[in-house]
Amino acid sequence: MTDEIDKAPHIPVLLGAILREVAPVSGVWLDGTFGAGGYARGLLEGGADTVIGVDRDPLAFEMAADWAGSYGDALRLKEGTFSNLDTLADEPLDGVALDLGVSSMQLDLAERGFSFMRDGPLDMRMGQIGVSAEDLVNDAPEKLLADILFQYGEERAARRIAKAIVAERLKCRINSTLQLAGIVEKCLPSKKPGQSHPATRSFQAIRIAVNDEFGQLAQGLMAAERALRPGGKLAVVTFHSSEDRIVKKFMSERSSTGGGGSRYAPEAAAKVPGFTLTPRKAIPPDADEIARNTRARSAKLRIATRTDAPAQPVAPETLGLPQLEGF
């Protein structure tokens, strides 16, 4: 297992853009998606005094054992989820970095069940606890499966795929990645040159559901607001439109003072922004980075700077989190 991971490239996406946009890097940063450690190392070498590396996958820290010690006390590793990152730091943070992509070491290990390109058990759990993809695919009602595929994967053929999954699981339990990928492929047109694999959206949707990725993201963004000192930076890298919308809506909501409202309605109290947007628009990878790392092609970086206003919660409906009945 270790040899298979070591052969895979672990290239942190948009790290150079983060270091450039938040310069000068200093103080205490929290890398909420430690993974292979690319962001943590980049931040330390870029000027951070301390980086707290957080991950819910114990394998991340097992793989870091060979190099983490070279940073001494400057690198602190903590198992947990970034949804409660404000409880994992003993001091106000100068920066929080979140890379919302699945780490390459998870994708490249067939036994983790994330990839439709390698046969393995249908798992997809990032933390190895809770309901697995196999449990969800075999036990969820057809309507819930269709809603998950549509809401989390933006899969237009969601109902057709859910129906096919239910029909197949009546014959035998669906327990491998290639078995599920094959069911999905039969429901969709053949892949054309340049198109993504037909199972991409379905696997994304099931992974998001299994790991509660949207709920974790919403909680993590609010936790970052609580944890950052005034002037601290929040840098978030997203990889698909659904999660980017959540980040965009959060940053827009918490950098706004409120709309003009109606002259016929009672005057609402003005909101005090918890962030300023720096820059206001998302930053994409440049052509050179995409050429070096094709996984970067859909990535977007959004950065916000903390103000001194008190942190405020944001309702899930404001962030556009899908509300699935029965899930």
From Swiss-Prot:
The record lists S-adenosyl-L-methionine as bound by G37, G38, Y39, D55, F82, D99, Q106
Function as written in the Swiss-Prot or TrEMBL entry: Specifically methylates the N4 position of cytidine in position 1402 (C1402) of 16S rRNA.
Q: Which InterPro entries match?
A: RsmH (IPR002903), SAM-dep_MeTrfase_MraW_recog (IPR023397), SAM-dependent_MTases_sf (IPR029063)
Report the top EC class in one word. Answer: transferase
Q: Which SUPFAM superfamilies match?
A: Putative methyltransferase TM0872, insert domain, S-adenosyl-L-methionine-dependent methyltransferases
Query: Known Pfam families for this protein?
Result: Methyltransf_5
Q: Name one GO biological process term.
A: rRNA base methylation
The record's section on HAMAP family has: 16SrRNA_methyltr_H
Q: Give positions of region: Disordered.
A: 303-327
Q: Indicate what this protein is called per its UniProt record.
A: Ribosomal RNA small subunit methyltransferase H
Q: Which domain of life is it from?
A: Bacteria
